[in-house]
Regions:
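Conserved core of the PLP fold type I
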Residues: 1-103, 115-129, 133-135, 202, ...
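A generic "structured core" feature
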Residues: 20-22, 40, 95-96, 107-108, ...
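Conserved PLP-binding active-site segment of the aspartate aminotransferase-like
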Residues: 155, 233-239, 255-296
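Conserved glycine-rich beta-strand-loop-beta hairpin in the small C-terminal domain of fold type I
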Residues: 200-210, 221-235, 242-248
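PLP-dependent aminotransferase class I/II
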Residues: 135-215, 222-224
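Hydrophobic residues in well-ordered beta-strands that form the structural core
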Residues: 30, 51, 109, 182, ...
Length: 306
């Protein structure tokens, strides 16, 4: 418990870690594509982001070493990589930890969406394998609601004093009465029961979106339906014209972020980051139908124009 710090959310915790452990100009590996909110937070501190590609096993450690083996830290989302949905393999987790030990670097583990795993056992956190180099960032924004503004850090014992000092220079800690209320919910089993109810609902929502896109988009969209999380990624095929994703989104009249928004280096086809929490089934089906049809129409028109 002495290594757990309560913060106002993941971005607050990440900012504390940077202020406590790094200096402006220090190099930080960042998944590319990656979570845009964390990208903005890191850039605001003055560190230098080193974009590292992601494949089917997570962040490509060898590519990171080639780009900057002496980086001071790495920011990763190993449980449910944003936005690809990939879960980092155990081999890749070990490789990342080995690099951190050799380089004397820190790993900021954002355990994004780990609570909503739909199949298989829970994944082993990096902090559970190599705790001395890992700062674990967690939040209740997805399990409860974002407006709660409560998250937490699990910090290696040797770093606690530095992170506490950084927090004392900012806002001390979130309101205690909210922490007490949340602690009561946890102790009474309310949150665990809530999670058990919501997992099958979100799994069903994922399947509704994936099935509708498969039906209406055909080969115009390639789907990655992950085994956890609250969004899926639908990408355009290789060779899709530049700007097609924006046109498709506009014609479909949906709100979503594009895959290109999450990229530092623009490479590969664009796509759509599709969240499915908080919507009725008929709304999800309708949005997926419009997106699939718009993708078919725009790409068909582009093909005829060539």
């Amino acid at each position: 418990p002495s290594c757990i710090l309560i913060v106002s959310g993941t971005q607050h915790g990440l900012r504390l870690c940077i202020d406590a452990l790094l200096a402006p100009g220090d190099a930080v590996w960042f998944e590319d594509p990656g979570y845009f909110a964390s990208r903005h937070t890191l850039r605001a501190t003055g560190v230098t982001l080193v974009p590292v590609p992601v494949d089917g096993e997570g962040i490509v450690v060898t590519a990171g070493e080639k780009a900057d083996a002496a980086a001071k830290a790495a920011y990763v989302t190993p449980s449910h990589q944003f936005p690809t949905g990939v879960a980092m393999s155990m081999a890749r987790r070990i490789a990342l930890l080995d690099w951190a030990r050799r380089a004397g670097a820190y790993i900021f583990e954002d355990d994004y969406d780990s609570e909503y795993r739909f199949a298989g056992p829970p994944l082993t956190a990096l902090a559970g394998i190599g705790a001395e180099r890992v700062i674990y960032l967690g939040t209740f924004a997805k399990t409860l609601f974002a407006g709660l503004r409560l998250g937490y850090l699990v910090v290696p014992p040797a770093l606690v004093a530095r992170v506490v000092a950084a927090r004392a220079a900012q806002d001390r800690f979130p309101p205690v009465f909210m922490q007490d209320a949340l602690a009561d919910l946890m102790a009474d089993g309310v949150i665990s029961a809530h999670m058990r109810r919501m997992r099958p609902r979100y799994r069903q929502a994922r399947d509704v979106v994936a099935d509708a896109l498969a039906r209406y988009a055909g080969d115009s969209l390639h789907l990655a339906a992950p085994a956890q999380g609250l969004h899926l990624l639908a990408t355009l095929p290789h060779g899709a014209p530049k700007g097609a994703a924006k046109l498709i989104r506009e014609r479909a009249d949906i709100e979503c972020r594009l895959l290109s928004d999450a990229r530092i280096v623009q490479r590969g086809p664009d796509g759509f980051i599709l969240g499915y929490s908080g919507f009725a089934t008929h709304d999800l089906t309708g949005a997926a139908r419009r997106l699939g049809r718009a993708a078919q129409e725009i790409l068909s028109q582009a093909g005829r124009a060539r």
